[in-house]
Amino acid sequence: MKSSLTLLFLAAIGYTIAYPPSSDYDSGYGGGGGGGGGGGYGGWCGGSDCYGGGNGGGGGGGGGNGGEYGGGYGDVYGGSYGGGEYGDVYGGGCGGPDCYGGGNGGGNGGGGGCNGGGCGGVPDFYGKGLLDSYGGDSYGNDYYGGSNGRRNGHGKGGKGGNGGGGGKGGGKGGGNGEGNGKGGGGKNGGGKGGNGGKGGSYAPSYY
């Protein structure tokens, strides 16, 4: 009888070590990182009334930090502002909803190429875009653009953003965005960007 109780006691201790009770901090599931953003669009329209590059794809949101705030709203806080007319300034950053999530925000999406005269940004009303206006180059690298956005309606869409990192608790990071947007040309130019990466799987916090 005594030996049975001893074995039972040891088994209980072993189970507690292997599967400790969750605390308030690390309970629940760590969210997976958001998927990477798609490629950029080419621009609004061609000719002298061109408004420079279209929107770049944003990066994915970061994973959650030990709780239920995984990856959601990645499009809003983690990436919608990536690329596009503001180049690579607003990519990534916050993780889950309202920045409660842990993990890293995704990489920046690429800025759209120019569509019409000149490169990036607002037109100067003489048929050319202002070369150093907001817009980034065709890959979203520069905050103030540059002259790399391709002229005459052939801007190249930006690359997809990188997926966010996994949160505390084991969620995998999201995949990278796929492909580039097509070059812009004419009204509503620019093809659809690539698909975002798949979100990570959830996993219990003690994994």
UniProtKB/Swiss-Prot annotation:
Bias category Gly residues: which stretches?
158-200
Kindly provide the name given to this protein in its UniProt entry: Eggshell protein 2A
Q: Where is this region: Disordered?
A: 150-207
The leader peptide range reads 1-27
Keywords, comma-separated and alphabetical: Repeat, Signal
